[in-house]
Regions:
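Non-catalytic terminal and connector segments of soluble metabolic enzymes
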Residues: 1-139
């Protein structure tokens, strides 16, 4: 049985603004994650609120929604063996200061809020997050 999975990756506004998209993509490819779909978009605060609704009771929710909608983002569907776990390891800890060396967040994250990337935290969430940004892709 193959452990081929898909996961969602978002390159957040801070990294897009600093022109890090190609560098981050090369890290993904080097780590055997295939980019199946990619698009650069600018979402509204309402769309960010819908995407992050699982966090709506948390104190950082409004800031998170404002941040994700503050500039262009790059959303990607990644595919690979155990893609969800693999990508989470490549991303590193949410807080760049605590992230392991050579992870995306350690290399490029500015702060716990502006940590450059988002990745799905489970296979089920990956499916719903992919559907959020690529609604008509897999019907």
């Amino acid at each position: 049985m193959s452990n081929l999975e898909q996961t969602l990756s978002i390159i957040k506004p801070d990294a897009v603004e600093r022109n890090l998209t190609e560098e981050i993509k090369s890290i993904l490819i080097k780590n055997k994650l295939e980019i199946k779909e990619i698009k650069k978009i600018h979402i509204t605060k309402d769309e960010a609120a819908e995407f992050y609704k699982v966090h709506q009771t948390k104190p950082f929710y409004n800031d998170l929604c404002s941040y994700l909608s503050s500039g262009p983002i790059v959303v990607m569907i990644l595919e690979g063996k155990n893609a969800v776990i693999s990508y989470r390891k490549i991303m590193g800890s949410t807080d760049p200061k605590q992230a392991e060396n050579n992870t995306i967040r350690k290399l490029y994250g500015l702060s716990i809020d502006k940590n450059s990337v988002h990745g799905s935290d489970s296979v089920d969430n990956a499916k719903s997050e992919i559907n959020f940004f690529f609604k008509n892709l897999y019907t």
